[in-house]
């Protein structure tokens, strides 16, 4: 019966919609003047829940620790989501009813004429995910991580923070004490997540990076049968799988290399978009879909190393720390620290006038993308810069992007998803660390590396690591060149009336300007591709008439010759 999704309502009148349209275990009831109804999609029987809880989901299938929940309490409806944001929870109000669901697609069925949320689209173009509490659909909202949304009556919800990431007043300075405490916390985090396992094998996504390697090592130490899965992008870029092979050999566990060839990526593109539910524009999502697909043939539980960068200030923090120090010493500089932070997403912020058609551009004029970052970067919760960046990373890139998409992709393949770094005791402990223990000179994640240096090969622990090298630009400019003419066709973009019709060709020629060069070309195209496929395959928009006047209709070499001739 696991994993499953749910959709339900709470209001002053009974709805027959669920019985007519949705198959699954069903439960209904009434409290005071309100009635409620929930269907558990994918369940043959109603899951066992705590008193007053009418719906809940655990990402890993650990049923004493739910990631989202729906409760009834004294004529109140309460929707809640844990601080890590591992499972999504959505709601909308239609007449005298509050609808809620764990998938956006389920709520699309109850909205008579759904419309794209332009603010959500703009946020997506800035971050590669839709910033909470917005979604990509008008009148549908997401419950923010660490928040409960409460209705005492139908019309006026209240929002209550149930958790804040806060810097500790006392800092751990002693390296040996920190190492000893961290080793215990890491082992305990994994032991809690394997306590319910019997003799079945589990999978671990092993990139060869530090975080996933630590998880694999701890699973082996806990006596669990482990199978590792890693991606093989072929001869493009710098391969990471040799590091995964080294770790697997060291731990004596089987390793499955998953073929992430352009052909397999293309075949999995639309299924990935549907599985994600919301638009996510990072290039890693389709390769992760392939990992889940292969793993699901051999296991029901998958472990990952997601969250390690957020907890221990991974490599992406270095330029931000430099920017923060510079800003403190030069407070009158035109571009502030939050703007610098916004630039680290490397998306379309700052390019709005060249990206959006005039009607959309006019609608977003009153928006400031920095507003979506202010709470996460609030210095009152974390006075020191490094902890403030960690708080922001947990709340933004973690809870709104990395964790919910990992769970969605696992659920689509019937997998429970477990992330040992999403452990509250471990996370709270990291806010006690002195800055020097996180970033020691130029060495990021220093204290984590010190804690595990005897658990893994030295070259794995101490090597410089970057994010997963998905060869998006190579794919887009070579293997998917003609496909871009379909996915981002000027005729379709023109009829959609969001983006300029020639945006894709502007990107590949470098004419969009600024920093959209090299790897950013592929990232920018992928962001648009994922939105367009979501718009047609999830939102259900009909495609406009295609144009044949675009460079992607020609072989790329011939188009480049044509360009030279034109100049």
Residue ranges and their predicted role:
Residues 1-12, 138-144, 284, 301-303, ...:
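Adenosyl-5′-phosphate
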Residues 78, 87-90, 108, 237, ...:
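Short catalytic/ligand-binding loop motif for oxyanion handling, primarily in non-cytosolic enzymes
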Residues 272-274, 316-323, 545-546:
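Short secondary-structure boundary/capping segments
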Residues 293-296:
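Active-site nucleotide-sugar/metal-binding loop of Leloir-type enzymes
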Residues 299-315, 463:
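Short acidic/histidine-rich active-site segments
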Residues 312-339:
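A mobile, often basic/glycine-rich helix-loop segment
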């Amino acid at each position: 019966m696991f994993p499953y999704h749910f959709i339900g309502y709470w209001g002053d009148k009974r709805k027959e919609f669920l019985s007519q349209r949705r198959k699954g275990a069903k439960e209904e009831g009434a409290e005071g003047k309100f009635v409620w109804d929930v269907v558990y999609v994918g369940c043959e029987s109603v899951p066992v829940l705590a008193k007053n809880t009418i719906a809940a989901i655990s990402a890993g299938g650990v049923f004493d620790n739910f990631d989202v929940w729906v409760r009834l309490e004294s004529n109140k409806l309460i929707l809640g989501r844990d601080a890590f944001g591992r499972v999504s929870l959505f709601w909308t109000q239609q007449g005298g009813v509050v609808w809620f669901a764990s998938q956006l697609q389920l709520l699309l069925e109850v909205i008579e004429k759904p419309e794209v949320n332009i603010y959500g689209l703009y946020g997506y173009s800035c971050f590669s995910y839709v910033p909470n509490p917005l979604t990509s659909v008008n009148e549908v909202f997401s419950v923010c991580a660490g928040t409960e949304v409460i209705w005492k009556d139908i019309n006026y919800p209240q929002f209550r923070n149930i958790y804040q990431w806060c810097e500790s007043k006392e800092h751990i300075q002693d390296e040996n004490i920190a190492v000893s405490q961290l080793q215990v916390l890491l082992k305990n985090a994994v032991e809690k997540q394997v306590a319910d396992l019997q003799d079945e094998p589990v999978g671990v996504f092993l990139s060869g990076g530090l975080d996933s390697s630590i998880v694999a090592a701890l699973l082996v130490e806990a006596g669990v049968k482990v199978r590792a899965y890693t991606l093989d992008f072929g001869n493009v870029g710098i391969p990471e799988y040799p590091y995964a092979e080294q770790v697997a050999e060291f731990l004596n566990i089987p390793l499955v290399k998953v073929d992430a060839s352009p052909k397999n990526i293309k075949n999995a593109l639309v299924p990935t978009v549907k599985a994600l539910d919301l638009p996510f524009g990072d290039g890693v999502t389709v390769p992760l879909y392939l990992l889940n697909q292969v793993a699901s043939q051999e296991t029901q539980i998958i472990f990952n190393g997601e969250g390690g960068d957020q907890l221990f200030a991974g490599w992406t923090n270095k330029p931000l720390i430099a920017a923060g120090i510079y800003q403190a010493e030069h407070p009158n500089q035109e571009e502030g620290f939050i703007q610098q932070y916004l630039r680290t997403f490397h998306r379309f912020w700052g390019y709005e006038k060249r990206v959006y058609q005039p009607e959309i551009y006019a609608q977003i004029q009153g928006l400031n993308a920095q507003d979506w970052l202010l709470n996460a970067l609030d210095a009152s919760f974390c006075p020191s810069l490094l902890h403030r960046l960690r708080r922001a990373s947990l709340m933004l890139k973690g809870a709104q992007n990395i964790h919910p998409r990992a769970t969605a992709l696992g659920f689509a393949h019937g997998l429970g998803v477990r992330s040992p770094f999403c452990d509250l005791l471990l996370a709270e402990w990291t806010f006690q660390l002195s800055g020097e223990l996180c970033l020691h000179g130029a060495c990021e994640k220093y204290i984590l590396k010190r804690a595990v240096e005897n658990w893994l090969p030295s070259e794995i622990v101490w090597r410089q690591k970057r994010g997963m090298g998905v060869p998006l630009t190579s794919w887009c400019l070579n293997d998917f060149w003609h496909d871009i003419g379909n996915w981002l066709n000027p005729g379709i973009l023109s009829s959609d009336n969001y983006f300029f019709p020639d945006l894709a060709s502007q990107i590949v020629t470098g004419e969009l300007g600024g920093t959209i060069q090299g790897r950013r070309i592929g990232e920018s195209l992928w962001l648009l591709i994922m939105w367009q496929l979501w718009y047609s395959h999830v939102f259900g928009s009909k495609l406009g008439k295609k144009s044949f006047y675009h460079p992607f209709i020609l072989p790329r070499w011939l188009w480049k010759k044509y360009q030279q001739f034109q100049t």
